[in-house]
Structure formats: C-alpha cells, structure tokens
Regions:
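Serine-hydrolase catalytic core recognition
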Residues: 1-205
Length: 205
C-alpha cells in the first residue's frame, strides 16, 4: 500500500467516509493543469473541493455532507483552513497542519512561480492570505504546527491564531515542541492522529 494513504485508510477504518481529490494545480498532471492556479492559489483550488463534495450523493450514498471535516498538512493545511474560513457552509470542521497562512512569508522560489513578485503586484498575495478571513470563522478549527518547522515556519500559525483571537473567534492550537515540518517520531505521530480523531468526533458529532 502507498504510505501516503495510510492515515486516510486509518480514518476510514474509524468509520469516516474519506475523500481525496486532486484539485487544479496538483503537481504531476501537466503544465496546463498547474497554470490553472496562476495568480490565485485559493479560489479554484477550493471550488474544486466543493464540486467533489456536491457529487458525493451520487458517488457515495453513505456520505453525510451535513457533517464534513477537512484535514491537511502544509498546502493541505492551508486548504483546510481556507475551506472553513471561506466555505463554512460546506466544510463543518477543519484541521490545518503546518499551514501556510500568508504566502508572503513562504519561500519565494515557490510563491513567485505562481503569484509573481509581490513587490511588483501584491494583489494575488493579499487575495490568498488567510489573515483577512479571520473574522469569517464560524466552524471549529484546529491548528497544528511544529515549532521547529523550517519549511513553513510556525509564525504562519501564530499570526493566524492572533488574527482569530483579535476577531473574537474561538479555535484550537496544538504546538509541537521540537518537531519540524513533519513528525518523524512514531509515538508522536500516532498520538497526533488520535488527537485529530477526537477533534473530528467531537466537532462533527
């Protein structure tokens, strides 16, 4: 089995209907597919996920689309937070692991490929930042971040949490001391999954 899908299978074993969808921009599907997110890493990516959920009634009758959780790590963490902030009508709880929250703070070799130079045109960065959406949170959100993350630095989660607090929006933050972008310690990784499971069961009922 592909190790990338192990955690998804584990959540399925716990009774969840698990859906994995490659949205516009997912690597490995050709340059035209990647160009679909040029100057906007948010809108089309999110709408692709919404479209998949809308088709679930036909694809998987057991799925309850009134109780949808979304979880992800890194870009997937960004997408999970984006989903509950901008489409809380569709996504009812989110788990954002090591999320980018403002692309201005991420590596330029990645961001400028898709969003251009912010010194020339900052509009794509402003439009895809989660900071301006903090006031919109109406769904449960769990933020997880390794404090030693040298890829997506912990400042991303800290600034989003600060913005949510300033907007009076309750949320949960799980800092991982000594952990980098991923969690190499098996015991920590296992307990992290159990924590996410508890969060989803508690918030989705």
């Amino acid at each position: 089995a592909n190790a990338a899908f192990n955690s998804s299978q584990w959540f399925a074993d716990q009774g969840f209907v698990v859906v994995i969808a490659d949205n516009t921009g997912t690597p490995g599907k050709g340059s035209a597919w990647e160009r679909g997110v040029a100057n906007d890493l948010a809108q089309q990516v999110l709408e692709d996920q919404v479209e998949v959920l809308r088709s679930l009634d036909d694809l998987e009758p057991r799925a309850d689309t009134t109780r949808v959780g979304i979880r992800g790590w890194s870009f997937g963490g960004y997408l999970a937070a984006l989903a509950v902030l901008r489409r809380g009508d569709v996504f009812h709880a989110g788990i954002a692991g090591a999320p980018v929250t403002d692309w201005r703070l991420y590596d330029t070799h990645y961001t400028e490929r898709y969003l251009g130079n912010p010194a020339v045109n900052d509009a794509p960065y402003a439009a895809t930042s989660l900071m301006n959406d903090a006031h919109s949170l109406e769904r449960p959100l769990l933020l997880i971040h390794g404090l030693a993350d040298d890829n997506v630095v912990a400042a991303h989660t800290l600034q989003l949490s600060s913005a949510l607090l300033a907007a009076g929006k309750p949320h949960e933050v799980l800092p991982l001391s000594g952990v980098t972008h991923m969690t190499p310690q098996e015991e920590v990784a296992e307990n992290l999954l159990l924590h996410q499971l508890e969060f989803l069961r508690r918030t989705l009922g």
